[in-house]
């Protein structure tokens, strides 16, 4: 009975992918045929502090393969050493308009190496997120309990966590939230990246799940 329940749960799970490299229509079609049909997330801002000019065509390819705009997001990886966190967000949003990107949500990627000061990191985070809110960007946050604690302190709670979707990584190859542990003010996630750096369908992707 448990095995049957598990099969039904996996069959009804909503699976998708995220990509950081140019990806063709044929690759997206192949991925959809493998069951990754719910969402696609494309990198649009790089850690070098520049717009990813591959994003517009990759999104077009995803749309051509059957991913609707409603199911198409982008992610934003901030450049910490560049400073001017609010300015980066403004420049990014100008590029989104310039390239006429049609996406549902922007995910702000919170990981990696920032500064050695948690207070500085907290300030950088709020500069970035306050600018996104001021502009009116529909957004969420990508982050893990591990990086959150390292960057901001384990007790730090994001002021807008209750109204901001959370996408978290845990590479346990399990499309479920059974492993989630609260952090940063979030008591439940919206999406999980459950497997990373997969080579499939002539593309490099990460696997994602949402209920």
From Swiss-Prot:
<keyword id="KW-0929">Antimicrobial</keyword>
<feature type="domain" description="Ch-type lysozyme">
    <location>
        <begin position="14"/>
        <end position="211"/>
    </location>
</feature>
<keyword id="KW-0326">Glycosidase</keyword>
<dbReference type="GO" id="GO:0031640">
    <property type="term" value="P:killing of cells of another organism"/>
</dbReference>
<dbReference type="GO" id="GO:0016998">
    <property type="term" value="P:cell wall macromolecule catabolic process"/>
</dbReference>
<dbReference type="GO" id="GO:0050830">
    <property type="term" value="P:defense response to Gram-positive bacterium"/>
</dbReference>
<dbReference type="Pfam" id="PF01183">
    <property type="entry name" value="Glyco_hydro_25"/>
</dbReference>
<dbReference type="GO" id="GO:0003796">
    <property type="term" value="F:lysozyme activity"/>
</dbReference>
<dbReference type="InterPro" id="IPR002053">
    <property type="entry name" value="Glyco_hydro_25"/>
</dbReference>
<dbReference type="GO" id="GO:0031410">
    <property type="term" value="C:cytoplasmic vesicle"/>
</dbReference>
<feature type="signal peptide">
    <location>
        <begin position="1"/>
        <end position="13"/>
    </location>
</feature>
<feature type="active site">
    <location>
        <position position="109"/>
    </location>
</feature>
<keyword id="KW-0732">Signal</keyword>
<dbReference type="GO" id="GO:0007165">
    <property type="term" value="P:signal transduction"/>
</dbReference>
<keyword id="KW-0081">Bacteriolytic enzyme</keyword>
<dbReference type="InterPro" id="IPR051595">
    <property type="entry name" value="GH25_Enzymes"/>
</dbReference>
<keyword id="KW-0044">Antibiotic</keyword>
<keyword id="KW-0378">Hydrolase</keyword>
<dbReference type="GO" id="GO:0009253">
    <property type="term" value="P:peptidoglycan catabolic process"/>
</dbReference>
<feature type="active site">
    <location>
        <position position="18"/>
    </location>
</feature>
<feature type="active site">
    <location>
        <position position="111"/>
    </location>
</feature>
<dbReference type="InterPro" id="IPR017853">
    <property type="entry name" value="Glycoside_hydrolase_SF"/>
</dbReference>
<comment type="similarity">
    <text>Belongs to the glycosyl hydrolase 25 family.</text>
</comment>
<protein>
    <recommendedName>
        <fullName>Lysozyme 1</fullName>
        <ecNumber>3.2.1.17</ecNumber>
    </recommendedName>
</protein>
<comment type="function">
    <text>Has antibacterial activity against Gram-positive bacteria. No activity against S.aureus. Does not appear to have chitinase activity.</text>
</comment>
């Amino acid at each position: 009975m448990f095995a049957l329940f598990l099969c039904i749960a996996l069959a009804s799970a909503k699976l998708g992918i995220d990509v950081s490299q140019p990806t063709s229509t044929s690759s997206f079609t192949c991925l959809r045929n493998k069951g990754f049909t719910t969402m696609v997330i494309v990198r649009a801002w790089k850690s070098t502090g520049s717009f990813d000019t591959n994003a517009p065509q990759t999104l077009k390819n995803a749309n051509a393969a059957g991913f609707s705009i409603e199911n198409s997001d982008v992610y934003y990886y901030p450049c910490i050493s560049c400073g001017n966190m609010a300015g980066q967000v403004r420049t990014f949003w100008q590029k989104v308009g310039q390239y006429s990107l049609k996406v549902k949500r922007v995910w702000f990627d919170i990981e990696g190496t920032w500064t050695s000061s948690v207070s500085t990191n907290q300030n950088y985070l709020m500069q970035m997120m306050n600018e996104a809110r001021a502009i009116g960007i529909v957004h969420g946050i990508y982050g893990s309990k591990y990086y959150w604690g390292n960057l901001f302190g384990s007790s730090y709670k994001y002021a807008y966590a209750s109204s901001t979707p959370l996408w978290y990584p845990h590479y346990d190859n399990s499309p479920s939230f059974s492993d989630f542990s609260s952090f940063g003010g979030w008591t439940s996630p919206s999406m999980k990246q459950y497997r990373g750096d997969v080579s499939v369908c002539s593309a490099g992707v990460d696997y994602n799940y949402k209920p």
